[in-house]
Amino acid sequence: TCALPILFKELDSRARNVKKEDLEEFKKQIFWVYGYIDSIATPTKTSVTKIKELENEDDAIVSLEELSNKQEFKQEIAKPKFLNEEQKISSAQKGTLMHLCFQRLDESKNYTMEQIKEFVQNLVNRDIITKQESDAINITKLYEYTKSNLWQELKNAKEVHKEQPFYINLKSQDVYGNSSNDNILVQGIIDLYYINSKGEIILVDYKTDRINNGEEQKLIEKYSKQLEIYQKALEQSLQKNVSRKYIYSVTLGKEIMI
């Protein structure tokens, strides 16, 4: 311990003799900040769902991208009945069930309400969904969909493509709004696109958000970036421009142009 005062005195002496330019260089090295911090903070691969979560962290977002990974639509060993009875179907699960129905409805048919009920029951009979899940499906909204302008467009379309997966390279700044010029790989699934009788490509995304008439702008603002990414991916894949893109609002039972 007796040596400590001598050591401190020596260190103090050396510190006083440090050149100013050496001190400045030392500060630069100690407090150096990487100039491309956005690049290392940005993932090289992401999904449209993740992008939406960043923009709307409090929103329950449902799309066919999530549907493709849902375990409840894959055959598994049946759970005990008492467990199934205790489970409740969440709003997100209800949205996923509606997406599943839209995917499987036959656009060449003119469904009656009774036929829609039979369609849902058939999903149960084929073990695609459970009885409890079928009870959570809004039959009226499915029927409204088959009477919508969109449904009539699909009936007359040259081609109809559902649940189309895609990958696309985009600039990080276009996705996250940061300063990075790096490319990131974005993956997702397009709910629906079709080619109409005029040869135009129409892009559609189903949304189950609860909104009122007159609040369509909320959906447009919330999902415009998502559909912009879908449009870029589709145009890159088909080498042809998308003529129009729509949100189909399940709640309102109509298409909303973006």
Predicted ranges, named:
Residues 1-258:
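Structural signature of nuclease core domains in nucleic-acid processing machines
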